[in-house]
Amino acid sequence: MPFRELADTFERIEIITSRTQMTVLLVNLFKKTPPEIIDKVVYLLQGRLWPDWKGLPELGVGEKMLIKAIALATQSTESEVESLYKSLGDLGKAAEKLKAIYEEKLKKGAMSILAFVPVKRELTVSQVYETLSRVALATGEGSRDIKLKLLAGLLSDASPKEAKYIIRFVEGRLRLGIGDATIMDALAIVYGGGAHARPIVERAYNLRADLGHIAKILATQGLNALKGIKPQVGIPIRPMLAERLNNPVEILKKVGGIAFVEYKYDGERAQIHKLGDKIWIYSRRLENITHQYPDVVDYARKYIKANEAIVEGEIVAYDPDTGELRPFQELMHRKRKHDIHIAIKEVPVKVYLFDLLYVDGEDYTLKPLPERRAKLVEIIEQTETFQIAEYIRTNNPDELEKFFLKAIEDGAEGVMIKALHKNAIYQAGTRGWLWIKYKRDYKSEMIDTVDLVVIGAFYGRGRRGGKYGALLMASYNPDKDVFESVCKVGSGFKDEDIDKLPEMLKPYIIEHKHPRVVARMKPDVWVTPALVAEIIGAELTLSPLHTCCLDIIKPGVGISIRFPRFIRWRPDKGPEDATTSQELLEMYKRQLKKLSE
């Protein structure tokens, strides 16, 4: 198939805004496309060479190399290319114009007889696709020269219009505005017999997120082949998405009165695929992130008790010394391509699993949630770092609200509420009311540090095993002359701080809660209120576990600090000099801000 057919379609699509007209153009294009190359045509329409999840290299061509390639292909100087690019503001248009000038010179015989005049051939879609693939896959020593030679050769054979779109494709600026939905509309019409085939095409794409692959099956094997599509280990499934509500009563009505309510962790959503010892991990956006999480790969090999499986969960950063969850931002350290072994130590992670999509040849996406969850529990050997997401089953709005506040207290973003009825299937690639996320519509950002009193201590884990690993902290309520718990802090301590804790706390350890202490959370060791520490956190939040300002803002809950961190000891302050509960209440109200949707 000549590449000019594709370039002509690109040009027509650029000047229209109607999706219906776009569909008509794609229908005409697909009718001309040989079935064996439909996948390549679809990828080029999407502005890519292959799906992101394959983890294959991108083109890796910068602007300077493109300018060199255009100069070589058009017998121009690089400064001429740069000058035209500057005036037009579009490198593709610059290539088109220079190519037209060059071809006009050739026609008029104005070129020197000694000049190199390449033999021009008509480009095909396959040639363009294969050449660009070779450009992308060229790596290592000498790869820049290889890329330049391939691009210059491709542009030499291209017409002016073809050159424009080749350059734009390589730049990642095709700007056609064609969505996957429009491509699926056209595929259904051409190969499926009409719009009635559209849901079948979409479901197949949702189960195997590779539209070129789906198009080729449809074009070469027919609609019945798509009807039989199941999940395939190694090809990501497009994730199911949730609607949003902030009222527990309304939420339970929406899902049928009873639901699973599970923590919505502040981490990276991950789809984990297992085939024997081979593991793939895909992000919410279906990018291959396996290399970022070699520790999760190890967990999946060990603890998924099935030969083939596709499970979903959340990868969450945590502090191994305290067990506390850490903010999503800390996972950014895992993005590095080098020294990942260092990042593993700096940012340890846990996996909280919440769904099963496929296991040992059986598609679970059409099964209701209780059945999927039961099978998930069956095939997972739960450990501290690889476990099922914390959840409850409830039909009670008050119980839902309490669990929501507990989730916030434990470092989660909120909760997910999931329908349990027989139609509660896994709707791949779809946002709907089978899942509802309940997140706070407010937050109280913590700008200032506070001074809190130690009222208890917790034994450490991991490196802190055999030592104290965290402290229970309180504010002072002068009206009642009591100390009210605010947070459990285990972060921010240096090793020497941890080493000194036994000696510091020893004079104040008591066998029971001090009579001036009001606390719901029970530490391993109670401490007489005496030591004061400066604490900072991400934000002030409401908690059913702490007693600072209990019942003042909302029945049954107090004020707490999310992601608290130790700054330093305040030996200059006595316990009654600590931040008061009233001060925390004022901070909470003053800093309250609406969260954007």
From Swiss-Prot:
Give the record's note on temperature dependence.
Optimum temperature is 75 degrees Celsius. Activity declines at temperatures from 75 to 80 degrees Celsius.
Task: Provide the catalytic activity annotation.
Answer: ATP + (deoxyribonucleotide)n-3'-hydroxyl + 5'-phospho-(deoxyribonucleotide)m = (deoxyribonucleotide)n+m + AMP + diphosphate; ADP + (deoxyribonucleotide)n-3'-hydroxyl + 5'-phospho-(deoxyribonucleotide)m = (deoxyribonucleotide)n+m + AMP + phosphate; GTP + (deoxyribonucleotide)n-3'-hydroxyl + 5'-phospho-(deoxyribonucleotide)m = (deoxyribonucleotide)n+m + GMP + diphosphate
Regions crossing the membrane: none
Query: Which GO terms fall under molecular function for this chain's record?
Result: ATP binding; DNA binding; DNA ligase (ATP) activity; metal ion binding
Influence of pH: Optimum pH is 6.5.
Active site residues according to the UniProt entry: 264 (n6-amp-lysine intermediate)
Q: Which Gene3D superfamilies match?
A: DNA ligase, ATP-dependent, N-terminal domain (1.10.3260.10), DNA ligase/mRNA capping enzyme (3.30.470.30), Nucleic acid-binding proteins (2.40.50.140)
Instruction: Give the binding site residues for ATP.
Output: 262, 269, 284, 314, 354, 431, 437
Q: Which cofactor does it need?
A: Mg(2+); Mn(2+)
HAMAP family assigned to the protein according to its UniProt record, in alphabetical order? DNA_ligase
Q: List the NCBIfam families.
A: dnl1 (TIGR00574)
Q: What does this protein do?
A: DNA ligase that seals nicks in double-stranded DNA during DNA replication, DNA recombination and DNA repair. Can use both ATP and ADP.
Family according to the record: Belongs to the ATP-dependent DNA ligase family.
Q: What is this protein called?
A: DNA ligase
Q: What is the lineage of its organism?
A: Archaea, Thermoproteota, Thermoprotei, Desulfurococcales, Desulfurococcaceae
